[in-house]
């Protein structure tokens, strides 16, 4: 077996070493992942981020080195985290960062790390949402923390934090932070660390028998934190910091004082706050400086705690100054952001084989982001390859749930290099080519560069290189420091690049110079030709919401090389060449383009472009191009043989002195306002002009003169949608056509996609990707449905979710979680959500959603706005409102939405009491199906009125108009609706649209009064028609309480029935205040009989005056149709008369359930006294309202009160337990009204005493054995503690005591009665040296009831030393071996013996004399032996001996005639029975002296013996009543058969010592 164990252990170690995983570089995994890889080690400098892996089971040890991290994260609200390490042989060693975070999740998470040991010197974070209770347990057997541990919840729940193995110990020398958490102590706590409770957290010391180090600190960091300590008889001192501002310190029992001590006390000199419950207390070292008058007793009823009524103390003042320990100064950091949880982009290279069988290498951008549910998906944009003539490009957009593992590449080649965060420096570059061998040298960069499109863009970017066929100088241009730019996911900018790198967020900057060539770029000297890289590629990608992009062109002319640093913080790029083709929505038809920009000292600059007649660039809503101006005089010219004159103005932006040059023409048309980024500013006037063009392609070279003004003027170009012109709107494309291309998927497969491509010159951009080919009737729809699923065990279950249907193909998009209970309430409400379109763009939709439990179903989707401007819509919704008193209520009404602005138009009145009996009419928006006359089914939406089970359609909404992209005549010919108004007159040349909305108006009645009405209004043009008028606010009545300021300035609280009509309140009835009586004031209170709390009304007793009372009740009502229903309300009773005051409205299924019940509470009166009141409470959800307060009733003069109490009860099976509940007291009569249920798994503490053996040496050398007391107790957790009492040896009196003994095991208790005897075993007092021997726990020996002082004993006894006394010259020796206990009236206190034991009366010596003839006389003192038997044993004694008298030879026993001094054999001694006196034969009873003839010469005895009258009476007691105890005073237990004997109790010293010793131990 030993060999097998060793082999198994060796095999286990070998298996873990083989399966070990070592993380050496940053790694990100998303989706399902199996962590059964053995030991996991994360090396320094590396991190492992696991995202949306629902179950993470660690099967081996976990080691995180310094500067390393392990992150397990959930970003989905529907996905929880289950992280476990359950191997008892595994360890956790953290020197870096461990972070488990599921705070976005709406479900419960579990972090359960067991293992052999846990050592933390770094930082550990555990976070959950708190919507449902979560498990956070770090229960390793060996547990040590010297770093930071932080536990977070978004809101507090009943879940607790558990640290260490229960009943074990933990060592904390670091910081443990709690946020909305409860830490429940289950171990002893060592070390000098700190527990910090913050944001409504509680530290709960649940077991003080497990000691807490006096150097451990507890810090209450905010006003809602608290600490609670178990209250038992073993107090400790707890160091508490930060006590004040309303936070709480408490114990687990109500705070009650006794005769000598108050419920709490504070010592200003020591800083100790003592909280007491009668005899038990706990001490808290809160420090000095507190004002005792600011303490108050409160109740800590936080979630996850045993709620103790009035068991805590709060301090209303600020925290006095006190230095915090070093461990409490360790900052409680927030949960760090895990790598990979933010959307990111990176470039990748894909090598495939084309149709010709040749390898094709493509480069693209991978965009990783999440949808609205937190699910990850990726989209890839492929860059097109370059071509010398015409080139085509494709933009591949693939969307799929991401479950990829991403690692950075160490290669310097263009490859897949995603970073660990949202930034990306690695990218790729498509170099340009030239047909001339002496052409320009392609520019180079220190890193591969590429264009990274902005995250979330609805359009992809493409790059088309151009080739230069013109000769140019060979001055190579290099870019030593590639510029980089990162577009965050929330922004929308365009990005233009020419062999540049985009990575971190920064603007592209190229230094500029004046007349001397001071550029950092190498340039050719004194060359009049343009210095270029052979060509420059540009890519543009702009989502519809883009606001700004910058474009920088750099001149490498020897005269001047300058660019103005760009101040834009948006995406920007650098063009390190002077030859370019621009694909910024500008048609450049010539594939050969060469432009040169020169700059001189006089500030003039010229650029020629033989490639296109369109040398001006339109500024669109998606992108704008920025040219630097290097002239000192801010003037430049661009030559182009065109008839148009364009002006360029420069507008400096922000403090970085970037000049934004925008080209505009002299034609005026419609204008638009440019948008700028948040960090740029325009300090000059701006004029708007329009650019139009009659031709976009000219075969002959043309020039255009462009002049630039100073920095005080700016013109922004806009385009009108004329023929072949450049448009400023995002939907006006230069050329669009449909094409097909191949896409390489992530799994390497090649698929064909089709879509709409935009062509601008030689630049192609994918606008739309079509879904897979379907028939003309295959329409993709999404709907909610239910289906059956066969589980792995063969069972069939039903699931529901959202399914996408395309033709005959169905795809499950979302599966709803099953309802948690059968009573889930279905509600409908209006909301807004995000949808990811097929092209990867994200749009926002609104509609009506049905919620049942945690399941959501989309009922109606509102049509999107038809124009680009904000459209005002109105819909019905529900929201929460915080009232002036801080309470939260729910309101419903009609809300107007304009863009992102919401305005409340109408607030619906709450349900009223008048609508109880009758059906309530409500109006709401819904969707239904209609079967048309041709049999087809269509869906309509509108406003429906519901009255009972009847529905009436009030308004039917117009169906949305769906237009194709190129159908410009589609849609209503209306102008845009102003987003700032609810309705607007249509333009004069447009057809008016009829719309319906809810509004409020005032009406003047015939009597001149003005009232306000609300309803649904139809608007057609400027004509308004009222369709529906809402009913006015109804009047409702309910019971409430309010405060009133009396004439003397005092504030009183009144209760009564209030009528509410709209926002108007009227008091109908004011309840009489309750009469407060003292307990003994029998004349106080109304002279009425007691009202039974279980009935709604009761007859008043005769002879009493009837008092009118009001209370809540429920009754049954029969309708006119014979149906029966139940109503509730407030009933007034006067004598035997009942009147219904108020009928409560019935509760609806969509709201909280309203209940009413009787309760008792405490009220602080104006004089500071606390009184108890009872009444009827109305509970709706978490809100409580006092409906009626009962007046104290009297029964024959006695006052009836109700209060909460705790008592001890013996159940029918003999079990003794402690119960709590509400007790009613009337005079001296007490009745139990309510018994609180006991918490599940309650274990009662047990205290049991056992005897132990002490041995002492008497002065005469004898050993005296006594029994001591061993106290064995168990706490509420069942943990046994054993303590042996110290027994003094100071008692030398003989007393007896009778005790009633109660012995409890768990919650079963037994009672018996016994008698104890104390006596002195040693004649003199000597110091005792004791040794104890535990009698064992097999049979309980003794215990003492703390309340009564009674002792419990059992039936085992040890031998006692004999005690010798002398009586009448005879020595009585008693046997010392016994199995039972006995006392006798003999002074010797002899103990009983076995049946063969006997007591001996020793014979004395004697002499004789006589004549020689054989006769004579003599005297002797020979003793007689009396046999003594156990009074409980009827058998005769044996072994009786008689010592022979000293006589002449020949004497023998038995004696013969003749001689004297012979011993006498007593008769009857062997048959002494109970209560019998032994007799001796020979004529005398019990002789002590024998005289007679002596033995003469020759040995003949002569003479007759005679007996003296000296006698010894020996009597025996048959009934035993106690036990013998030693001089130590410790009781020797008696036999079980003697239990029940009683006699008077003497207040002996030894009993006092026993009680003192036991209570001192407790």
UniProtKB/Swiss-Prot annotation:
Q: How is it modified after translation?
A: The GPI-anchor is attached to the protein in the endoplasmic reticulum and serves to target the protein to the cell surface. There, the glucosamine-inositol phospholipid moiety is cleaved off and the GPI-modified mannoprotein is covalently attached via its lipidless GPI glycan remnant to the 1,6-beta-glucan of the outer cell wall layer.
InterPro entries named in the record: Cell_wall_rpt, Hyphal-reg_cell_wall_N
* Pfam families found in the cross-reference section: Hyphal_reg_CWP, Hyr1
**Positions of the UniProt region annotated as Disordered:** 338-366, 383-729, 1404-1424, 1455-1486
Q: Which GO terms describe its cellular component?
A: cell surface; extracellular region; fungal-type cell wall; side of membrane
Write down the membrane topology: Lipid-anchor; GPI-anchor
- The name on file for this protein is Cell wall protein RBR3
Native source species = Candida albicans (strain SC5314 / ATCC MYA-2876)
